[in-house]
């Protein structure tokens, strides 16, 4: 925190000379009479009853209302930022710095409040509806309605607009093919009504560049840059919203003033850095354009050269080199332009000032974000490839280097192993294609005493395994005692009714919470350390058994006990946890699983490690996608682990615990380090501090002859909600 505090005085705002605080005099234009969610719902209802003019009216109003609210929010935030200009604090007493800082915050807040709606929640879109607008769903309704009222040109534009963002939509593709064959439909009718100006201009510039029309290329690329910074300003302004709690974290969030400010400000900065990706993304395309902003100057320097403008060519080359100073080709180009123009004329030409300012601001933001990643465990994934290495703290650089080297080594060795397996598969020509799924499985468990009891074949599925002997009887008892002790100490969700059934209670503890309670002497510290080590043990077993090419990262983990409520068991027909899929929303009637939020789409593998079997019910079972046809059942017992991939191939549930208490460690993993658990980073650091060792004790059990497994991830992001297996 100490490195952040000196920066605070630089952020002081004031709205003119000292004076009384008050709301701004300026007021924004009125908000739409109806919020976009109500208009969208009205349009959908009109569609259902076939009232096509009403569909057009309501959906068009919904689109305009959402755009107006967003534009109003951007205008308001930018106006308030401009009205509270930065003032230097040099020469002031140090004791006044904090007061001036918060005085500026109050002025900004008063300004924002003055232009906000009287009922802000009425105009705030929920996640689901925001997703519908991002998917351009209103245009799906509109294209049908326009066609029904014989406005074919508008129908074509709406269909094209929807298809640009949904290129896999088969029906819309067929509609567009039909429109192309219709008489009177022009090519210009196929317009993207949601096209972003900066991307449109960039594409035009690149097209003219490819067609060797440098003058036209320059015109559109320069326009693209202007529009880019307009879009960047708007995107960054929209980041300054309320704090986004992750899952159920708000129930346990407990931070002091500076921790809360840090958490929120880092979230805002991370969002603003994410505008780089947002502005480089194209609807319907999975990956954004790499190095999007610098690439403008790569095109421009050569276009200006072909146009005979060496001054501008030098300016753009030097600007590009701000991002990639060691680019060999660009340095050669710059040397050539300088030689042609002359050293005396070329030397005074500087990179563009607005790009210098952009780069400086971006690097300062990255320094703060990497610092918070290193010190507080708040993850940050840099969207740029041009960031200088020295911006990243040395300790974090070393961590990332070790992770990359370990991942590369494991990938290479697994690749060699897979080549051997592929050779075996080719030799067995008579085996079915399904066999390849099982061949990937079956790697060593890497720990003595552990053995595979059931594999995918015996569990009637794919990417499934049951392992016994993961824990000893004494370790199971010790971890059960830890759960009860942590519940007595209080961890935020002890003794609550289960979120999945009113007939059971549950309580539990996360790894970090257990370690903190151990540090405070409220639970045995060695038991908390055992809990940490056991989760690492399961992770390494999963990586090795499923022969994963990249490391697994913890997405969420907790030790939880479910207890049957005796008086609520009579006539009980529900499950302890109904059938579900861990990374998608299961629609059992349609036999589909939709991989989109609010599902935890980033989860790739799941595991549950049982601590006991002395209870009634509580069996774990797999089903088909219909959630009814059971394919396999696993009875819990001490030291038994069930591991499986988290996708639609593995719907699963937990049968009712009808008597006694069932305790287990539930673990979810991700292959994407951006979604790894923030608490895990803090737990890793706490273990190193408490036990003064660089390696977890259990890792020493792995013999030198066995296959290497993935290194422990030190990346971290958010803790998911308290969901259970």
From Swiss-Prot:
Xref: PROSITE patterns: ER_TARGET (PS00014), FE2OG_OXY (PS51471)
Cofactor(s) listed in the protein's UniProt record: Fe cation; L-ascorbate
Polar residues composition-biased segments: 701-715
GO biological process, one term: collagen metabolic process
Catalytic reactions of this protein: L-prolyl-[collagen] + 2-oxoglutarate + O2 = trans-3-hydroxy-L-prolyl-[collagen] + succinate + CO2
Molecular function per GO: iron ion binding; L-ascorbic acid binding; procollagen-proline 3-dioxygenase activity
Active site location: 662
Gene3D superfamilies given in the database record: q2cbj1_9rhob like domain (2.60.120.620), Tetratricopeptide repeat domain (1.25.40.10)
Keywords annotated in UniProt: Coiled coil, Dioxygenase, Endoplasmic reticulum, Glycoprotein, Iron, Metal-binding, Oxidoreductase, Repeat, Signal, TPR repeat, Vitamin C
Name used for this protein in its record: Prolyl 3-hydroxylase 1
């Amino acid at each position: 925190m100490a490195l952040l505090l000196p920066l605070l005085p630089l952020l002081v705002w004031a709205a003119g000379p000292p004076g009384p605080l008050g709301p701004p005099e300026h007021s924004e234009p009125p908000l739409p009479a109806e919020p976009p969610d109500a208009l969208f719902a009205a349009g959908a209802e009109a569609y259902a009853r076939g009232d096509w003019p009403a569909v057009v009216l309501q959906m068009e109003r919904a689109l305009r209302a959402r755009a107006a609210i967003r534009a109003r929010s951007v205008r308001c935030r930018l106006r308030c930022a401009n009205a509270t200009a930065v003032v230097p604090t040099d020469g002031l007493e140090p004791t006044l710095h904090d007061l001036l800082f918060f005085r500026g915050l109050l002025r900004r807040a008063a300004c924002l409040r003055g232009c906000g709606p009287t009922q802000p929640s009425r105009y705030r879109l929920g996640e689901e509806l925001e997703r519908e607008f991002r998917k351009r769903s209103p245009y799906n309704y509109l294209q049908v309605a326009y066609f029904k009222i014989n406005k074919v040109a508008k129908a074509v534009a709406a269909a094209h607009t929807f298809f640009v963002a949904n290129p896999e939509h088969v029906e819309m593709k067929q509609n567009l093919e039909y429109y192309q064959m219709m008489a009177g439909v022009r090519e210009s009718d196929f317009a993207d009504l949601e096209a972003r100006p900066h991307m449109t201009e960039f594409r035009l510039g690149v097209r003219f560049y490819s067609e060797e029309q440098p003058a036209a290329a320059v015109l559109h690329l320069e326009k693209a840059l202007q529009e880019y910074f307009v879009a960047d300003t708007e995107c960054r302004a929209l980041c300054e919203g309320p704090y986004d709690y992750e899952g159920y974290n708000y129930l346990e969030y407990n931070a002091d003033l500076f921790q809360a400010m840090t958490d929120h400000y880092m979230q805002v900065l991370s969002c603003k850095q994410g505008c780089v990706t947002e502005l480089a993304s194209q609807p319907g395309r999975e990956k954004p354009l790499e190095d999007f902003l610098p690439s403008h100057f790569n095109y421009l320097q050569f276009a200006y050269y072909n146009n005979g403008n060496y001054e501008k060519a030098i300016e753009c080359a030097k600007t590009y080199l701000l991002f990639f100073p060691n680019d060999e080709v660009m340095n050669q180009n710059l040397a050539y332009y300088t030689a042609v123009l002359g050293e005396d004329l070329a030397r005074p030409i500087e990179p563009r000032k607005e790009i210098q300012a952009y780069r400086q601001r971006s690097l300062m933001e990255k320094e703060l974000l990497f610092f918070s990643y290193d010190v507080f465990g708040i993850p940050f994934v840099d969207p740029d490839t041009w960031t200088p290495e020295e911006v990243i703290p040395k300790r974090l650089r070393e961590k990332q280097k070790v992770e990359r080297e370990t991942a590369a080594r494991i990938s290479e060795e697994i690749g060699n192993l897979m080549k051997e397996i592929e050779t075996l598969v080719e030799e067995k020509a008579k085996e079915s294609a399904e066999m390849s799924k099982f061949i990937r499985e079956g790697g060593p468990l890497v720990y003595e005493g552990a053995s595979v009891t059931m594999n995918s074949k015996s569990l009637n599925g794919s990417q499934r395994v049951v392992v016994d002997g993961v824990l000893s009887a004494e370790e199971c008892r010790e971890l059960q005692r830890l759960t009860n002790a942590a519940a007595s100490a209080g961890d935020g969700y002890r003794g609550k009714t289960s979120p999945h059934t009113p007939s059971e209670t549950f309580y539990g503890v996360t790894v970090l919470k257990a370690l903190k309670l151990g540090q405070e002497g409220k639970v045995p510290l060695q038991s908390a350390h055992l809990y940490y080590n056991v989760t690492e043990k399961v992770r390494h077993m999963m990586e090795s058994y499923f022969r994963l090419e990249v490391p697994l990262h913890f997405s969420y983990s907790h030790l939880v006990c479910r207890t049957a409520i005796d008086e609520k068991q009579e006539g009980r027909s529900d499950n302890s946890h109904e059938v579900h899929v861990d990374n998608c929303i299961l629609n059992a009637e349609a036999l589909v699983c939709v991989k989109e939020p609010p599902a935890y789409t980033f989860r790739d593998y799941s595991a549950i490690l049982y601590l006991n079997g002395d209870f009634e019910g509580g069996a774990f079972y797999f089903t088909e996608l219909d959630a009814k046809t059971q394919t396999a059942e696993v009875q819990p017992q001490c030291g038994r682990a069930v591991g499986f991939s988290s996708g639609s191939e593995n719907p699963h549930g937990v049968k009712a615990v009808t008597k006694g208490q069932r305790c287990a460690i539930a673990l979810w993993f991700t292959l994407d380090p951006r979604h790894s658990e923030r608490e895990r980073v803090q737990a890793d650091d706490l273990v190193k501090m408490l036990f003064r060792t660089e390696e977890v004790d259990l890792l020493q059990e792995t013999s030198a002859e066995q296959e290497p497994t993935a290194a422990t991830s030190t990346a971290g992001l958010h803790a998911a909600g308290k969901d259970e297996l």
